[in-house]
Amino acid sequence: MKLYLVPTPIGNLEDITLRALRILREEVDVILAEDTRTSGNLLRHYSISKPMSAFHINNEHKVVTSLAERIVAGERMALVTDAGTPGISDPGFLLVRECLRLGAEVECLPGATAFVPALVNSGLSADHFIFEGFLPHKKGRQTKINEISKNHYTTILYESPFRLVKTLQQLAEVCGNERRVSVARELTKIYEENVRGTLEEVINHFSQKEVKGEIVIVLEGIEKE
C-alpha cells in the first residue's frame, strides 16, 4: 500500500516531528530499521510498539523485492535509519526505486539530516553546494579529492572520527592550507562542536585531541575567475 521514509533525530531526541511520531504509531504495520536494537531503543523512548524488521546495507539487495511486493499487496511500512533521513548516505534508495517500479506509493517526511545544519552553521556559502557523502576509502579516493579541490561550490563530506585528520590533510595537500573549512562534530548532542578556520588551523585543532562522534566537513569552494 505505502512506504513511509521517516527521518529520526541525529542526536537530540526532541528533534523528531509530531507527524513522524503519528506515522510510526498509527499509520504503519511494520517498521524497517537499519539496526533494530538502535531503533528499538528509540521507539521505546517514544512509547511506540510495532513489529520491526532489519533493512541494512548487508541485506537490502536480498530483501528489497519481497518487501516492495508486500507493500504493493497492502502492507504499510516505515523505513528508518539509525539517525537522520533514509537514503542520505544510508539504505533507502533501492527500496524506493523498487516500490516505484511496482507501483507502490512512497511518501518521505521532512526531518533531520546532518549536513543541513552543518552547512548553514558553517559560515560558508549555502547558495550552491555539493553533497558528496563519504569519500571512497581506497579506489578513486585521490581522484575524488582532486575533483573536490576544483569545485567552485561549497562541498560537504561525511567522515568517521578516525579518518578526520587524514582527510583534512589530504584536502590541504591539493586545496592549500588557507582554504576555509568548517567541521561539525556530534551535532545536536551534548558535546556538539563546530570548528571553523583554515584547513591548517582546523587540522592543528583536531590533531591535539582524540576525535569522537559523527563528523561533517564543509569545505569552501574556489572563487570563479
Cite the ranges covered by each PLM segment:
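Glycine-rich, flexible N-terminal cofactor/catalytic loop recognition
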Residues: 1-57
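A charged, well-structured terminal subsegment
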Residues: 70, 140-156, 174, 218
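Glycine/small-residue-rich loop that forms an oxyanion/phosphate-binding "nest" at active or ligand-binding sites
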Residues: 64-113
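A contiguous loop/helix-start segment that scaffolds small-molecule binding in enzyme catalytic cores
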Residues: 154, 158-225
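Short active-site oxyanion
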Residues: 24-31, 103-106, 154-155
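Conserved helicase motor
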Residues: 54-61, 134-136
